[in-house]
């Protein structure tokens, strides 16, 4: 495997539109700031990865569009508009925008750092699909040697069935999926406490 795309899906840090489950605990403004900080850390790790791995093509896929000033604070990163009605469609569209091998992540999983991404890239050299299972039954990273939209179809998004159903789609396509170490994301107040306590490696 030579070139590989590392795709980051990111929402603009607009108060009230991001990290909504944190709002009751910290307020809309602070929730947006937390989202921006998480995203900045993730993008920073990916930039460090790209500097040490010239085969990496870093892409930031933005929602609702690329116009927010936050996205333009990373001038060396290529910006793209997310497209799709649900998360599955948005992920499929980004992955299938090129036939190159690709790894796709969000911005709210602290354990997905440079070292974690390096491992994902290495495993993707040997397996058609790599997935980072999350504690909540979803996943925080998916990589594919050959991007396929079918893996994202008929999934009950935002439920604890996401990982199981995704693995079923892979099996139906005869794609062996390699599971990376389990991760967690920052969605609720308890996750925020964990992140602030520096528990990203657990």
Language model features by range: what are they?
Residues 33-53:
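A short, N-terminal amphipathic alpha-helix
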Residues 50-78:
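Acidic donor-binding segment of Leloir-type glycosyltransferases
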Residues 112-138:
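Conserved donor-nucleotide/metal-binding helix-loop-beta segment in metal-dependent transferases, i.e.
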Residues 148-169:
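Short, glycine-/small-residue-rich phosphate/pyrophosphate-handling segment
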Residues 1-22:
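N-terminal nucleotide-binding beta1-loop-alpha1 segment
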Residues 164-202:
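Conserved alpha/beta core of the MobA/IspD/sugar-nucleotide pyrophosphorylase nucleotidyltransferase superfamily
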Residues 69-101, 159-162, 190:
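Short phosphate-binding loop-to-helix
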Residues 103-105:
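Short aromatic-hydrophobic micro-motifs that form the base-stacking/packing surface
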């Amino acid at each position: 495997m030579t070139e590989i795309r590392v795709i980051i899906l990111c929402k603009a840090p607009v108060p009230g539109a991001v990290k909504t489950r944190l709002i009751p605990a910290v307020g809309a403004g602070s929730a947006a700031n937390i989202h921006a900080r998480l995203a900045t850390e993730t993008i920073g790790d990916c930039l460090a990865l790209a500097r040490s791995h010239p085969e990496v093509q870093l892409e930031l896929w933005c929602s609702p569009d690329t116009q927010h000033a936050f996205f333009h604070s990373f001038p060396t990163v290529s910006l793209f508009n997310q497209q799709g009605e649900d998360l599955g469609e948005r992920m499929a569209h980004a992955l299938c925008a090129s036939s190159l091998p690709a790894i796709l992540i969000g911005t709210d999983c602290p354990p997905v750092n440079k070292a974690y991404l390096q491992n994902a890239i290495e495993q993707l050299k040997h397996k058609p699909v790599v997935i980072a299972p999350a504690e909540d039954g979803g996943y925080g990273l998916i990589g594919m040697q050959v991007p396929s939209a079918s893996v994202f179809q008929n999934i009950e998004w935002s439920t604890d069935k996401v990982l199981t159903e995704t693995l079923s789609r892979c099996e139906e396509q005869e794609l062996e999926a390699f599971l990376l170490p389990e991760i967690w994301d920052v969605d609720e107040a308890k996750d925020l406490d964990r992140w602030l306590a520096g528990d990203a490696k657990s």
